[in-house]
Amino acid sequence: MIKKGTLKYKWMMITTLIMFSTIILFCLVIIFFLKDTLRDGEIDEAEHSSSEIVNLVESRSMNNITTLDLTAMLENFEKAIIYDRNGKQLMQSSNENMINFKPDIDFVDPETIQISKHNGIPYLIITEPIHSERFEGYSVLIHSLEGYNNVVRSLYFVAIAFGLLATFIMAGISYIFSTQLTKPLVTMSNKMIQIRRDGFQNKLELKTNYEETDNLIDTFNDMMYQIEESFNQQRQFVEDASHELRTPLQIIQGHLNLIQRWGKKDPAVLEESLNISLEEMNRITKLVEELLLLTKDKVNIQALEFEEVNINEEIRSRIKSLKQLHPDYQFKTHLSKKPLTLQINRHQFEQLLLIFIDNAMKYDKDNKQIEIATQLRNKQISIEITDHGLGIPKEDQEFIFDRFYRVDKSRSRSQGGNGLGLFIAEKIVQQYGGYITVDSEVNQYTTFKIIFK
């Protein structure tokens, strides 16, 4: 039993209806032309018989013409009547198929060809005048169209029967074809249900020999891969965020317990525990801000407000502020002499600079020397930030832009890092079609190069 709402049912019904309509229309066109052809044949046959009768009467005298002579000139289901010029019947044919119909003829203005019905049977009537030396009168031929009507009715019957038969055949073919056509979709649906039940580890592996469904399967598998990757990233994000939040909370809890136990009576313990707790709260606040920023890293870039930012001026402004906060650090700049401007959201550009400069300062506690350079080459703007601190091992360089990744977790925590800064920076740069490269030697230097195309 086919359900009415299924694609198979709709496909079968549509194709069957189209084929049925096409066949019926084709049959009607054929019948129309056949009717005209058969009718013309009937008229030609009747006109031929009428001409034979007229020739017979004109070639002989009426006294030498018998009813058998008239009958010999006629085809089946025909009747001939001879009238004089006053409309008086003189003679009529006689055969086995006697036509019991005598039309009323207006001999004053007779119609040459007319059709009349008698007892439901149509007749073709041909009236021709006869002019000869021996006779003046009229010949009336009565030609039955009953056979013609029977043939036409038979044609309609055959057309309907053929249409119905063809419809059933097409319905069967459509059912088989629609079954084969929808089989891959049914299989895909079952596989999808199984994947929903068992998880994303099962991929949809099915070859249908149809380009469209094969493309659909490939697209579905790609989508499943992306969803699986997204779920894994989400799970990893929750785990990493929980871990990053748990550690400072545990530290705060420990010092609060310490204050509760000894801090009330010991001002030194109270002071130390409060300072450490405040530091951890600042760390949590920064982490939460960066986590909130991560939720916005896929915001439509068209929704941001752009302006033409002078890169060199912006770098000088940031360095001036940082020198006031960190007078013990040296900031060396090698800025392009050519003016460098970029259409970018100013807040994002400031954030980008602070991430890399802050990162350089964290991991260069000894030399305290930060170098910043800009240049324009091949219509590409590049910004280089270099520190001479701890450096990044080669094996870690490909992972440093991953979320929550830190080269040395214990040392990173002591520096105040949480592994989100570089991840956020890369997202910002990628929004503007740029990219970031890193070059580093352990205990020598680290250079981050930001390139905007």
From Swiss-Prot:
Q: Where is the Histidine kinase domain?
A: 240-453
Gene Ontology MF annotations: ATP binding; phosphorelay sensor kinase activity
User: What is this protein's function?
Assistant: Member of the two-component regulatory system ArlS/ArlR. ArlS probably functions as a sensor protein kinase which is autophosphorylated at a histidine residue and transfers its phosphate group to ArlR.
| Record's keyword annotation contains Repeat | no
Post-translationally, this protein is described as follows, namely: Autophosphorylated.
* A cellular component annotation (GO) from this entry: plasma membrane
Q: Which Pfam families match?
A: ArlS_N, HATPase_c, HisKA
Q: Which UniProt keywords apply?
A: ATP-binding, Cell membrane, Kinase, Membrane, Nucleotide-binding, Phosphoprotein, Transferase, Transmembrane, Transmembrane helix, Two-component regulatory system
* Gene3D superfamilies cross-referenced by the UniProt entry: 1.10.287.130, 6.10.340.10, Histidine kinase-like ATPase, C-terminal domain
Protein name, entry field: Signal transduction histidine-protein kinase ArlS
Modified sites of kind Phosphohistidine: 243
EC number in record: 2.7.13.3
Subcellular compartments: Cell membrane
Q: Please tell me whether the keyword Chloroplast is annotated for this protein.
A: no
- All copies of the HAMP domain together span 179-232
UniProt catalytic activity: ATP + protein L-histidine = ADP + protein N-phospho-L-histidine
Query: What gene is this protein a product of?
Result: arlS
Spans through the membrane: 14-34, 157-177
